């Protein structure tokens, strides 16, 4: 993306509202032109499209004075399903409560509704913003919808005692290590909290003993030094052993979609084509 052009445009206006995705917020915060924009009038900042990382949210409010209000939606249920109150004064990491006229619930692997607070399950949605179906693809539509008209989002989430939902990860991105579920976003949130890390993506890679292990791709901040050992030490006190990255690869950039979402699929495909499946274990 052409960030200098973005900042030139923003600097010519009084900014009251600003929507974006985590990668955009993060890239802007670390760009030298960020302070050329007058953020003092910013009243509403909405994050969506992907999980907003805690480190990015904290830095954003420190520099602009306006917290990121996170919401949740998807192409099949556009534009929004849940959102935090816009009057909120802090970033919570939750995706909020269902918007008006929308029903949201969690289901287990058998499609049964989960009623216990804090239990993880697939987010299913019913409301006026939910699609009627995929155009001329009845089989795929049938797979995506429940018998009572809920859309199966493929996203894993949880709900707290207040009725606030949290987005954990995509069901298809789940990493299974020795039978234990690992959500990439949890690993990424820990690694990205390191001041030397600009961006990171976690995926599962095949392992003969565990089925899968966690691999993290890391982009360093310009001029900063961070090694594998630094990251292992940081994660050792913050993640259970099976959630810790066992393989770390440093890169200059990470593949992104035109919307700024990281393309895990591309990274997984690159790993599948790698002839060297051996790894060094760290505990």
Roles of regions detected by a PLM:
Residues 39-42, 99-102, 197, 245:
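Core-facing hydrophobic residues within beta-strands of well-ordered domains
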Residues 49, 73, 96, 155, ...:
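Active-site glycine-centered loops adjacent to acidic/histidine catalytic or metal-binding residues
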Residues 10-11, 18, 127, 132-133, ...:
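AMP-binding/adenylate-forming catalytic core of the ANL superfamily
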Residues 269-283:
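Acidic/polar alpha-helix N-cap and adjacent early helical turns
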Residues 69-76, 96-98, 203-206, 249:
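Beta-strand->loop->alpha-helix junctions that form or flank phosphate-binding loops
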Residues 7, 15-20, 29-90, 103, ...:
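Gly/Ser/Thr-rich phosphate-binding loop
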Residues 3-7, 26, 34, 142, ...:
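Short hydrophobic/charged patches on amphipathic alpha-helices used for structural packing
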Residues 97-101, 112-144, 182:
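Conserved ATP/PPi-binding loop(s) of AMP-dependent carboxylate-activating enzymes
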